[in-house]
Amino acid sequence: MAKLTKRQKAIAAKVEAGKAYTFEEAASLLAELSAVKFTESFDVAVNLGVDPRKSDQVVRGATVLPNGTGKTVRVAVFTQGPGAEAALAAGADKVGMDDLAAEMKAGDLNYDVVIASPDAMRVVGQLGQVLGPRGLMPNPKVGTVTPDVATAVKNAKAGQVRFRTDKNGIIHTSVGKVGFEAAALKQNVEALLADLKRLKPSTSKGIYVKRVTLSTTMGPGLIIDQASLDA
């Protein structure tokens, strides 16, 4: 049997397996256990009572976290004319059409979010094999294909997260950084849960939000007592 590392021993000594922690307890303990040389993210996993094999039970959308994610977000926008000026004014890092598509085909993909106006989809449609595998393909269901590109840019820069149930019916997303106040993290998670509940499929039966787990990038996952969340 492999020996536990010093970090693993510290986690084993302080984490009670199977316990449901209040949100504040979990955030505090995870921050205490963070002992790496970079600032870890706080991540949340939400197990939903859906059957992801059924297309009408796939939950996807986007949430603007009230306190952001703590990350600097690079945004590229496919649009032209007045939309291009509005996108740049809103803080877009790069705006273009065929020129931007050519750069991306050549390997310049240093962006976290790609947004497009509807009239630009004729250009973006050529980039499916480039953007799709990276999760960057604009999609109207998460607000990244929109005539109001300026608002989409502002939302992305403000800390909007996009989500979709995986094959097990679980939503995974980042909700902040170690160093965030617990209250700010909690507001972010509550905003996410509120949107998930709003998007509940009509065909979903039984308990919808089955489990909420909070973790850090390199840390353990702690089950959250949902009674400690206002959502």
From Swiss-Prot:
Biological function: Binds directly to 23S rRNA. The L1 stalk is quite mobile in the ribosome, and is involved in E site tRNA release.
One example of a Gene Ontology biological process annotation: translation
Organism: Ectopseudomonas mendocina (strain ymp)
Cellular component, GO annotation: cytosolic large ribosomal subunit
HAMAP family: Ribosomal_uL1_B
UniProt xrefs under Gene3D superfamilies: 3.30.190.20, 3.40.50.790
Keyword terms: Repressor, Ribonucleoprotein, Ribosomal protein, RNA-binding, rRNA-binding, Translation regulation, tRNA-binding
Family listed: Belongs to the universal ribosomal protein uL1 family.
A GO term, aspect molecular function: structural constituent of ribosome
Coiled-coil positions: none
Keyword RNA-binding appears in the UniProt entry: yes
Family annotation (PROSITE patterns): RIBOSOMAL_L1
Quaternary structure, from the entry: Part of the 50S ribosomal subunit.
Gene responsible for this protein: rplA
Name by which UniProt lists this protein: Large ribosomal subunit protein uL1
Top-level division of the source organism's lineage: Bacteria
